[in-house]
């Protein structure tokens, strides 16, 4: 009986460590929103969203295709910044996120 409860606890705790893809996208949008008009480099997004460099690039490409983020190059870096559509989406996402949290649901 004790082993079953311990196994269940481990399963629940291990599930809580991971974010959904929407949660990750929300974190990236949050970082790019805070980056302002100058944009944010990949390493800053990686650090603030707690993602690998390659995961950031992969998710940012999806956000670019959806029109939520845009990219620009300056002298040395590729920078990402949130679009108007991205800002609108992010506001709705935060509202949805707050609703789920108020209902004790994970997204």
Residue positions per predicted region:
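A short, conserved structural fragment
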Residues: 64-74
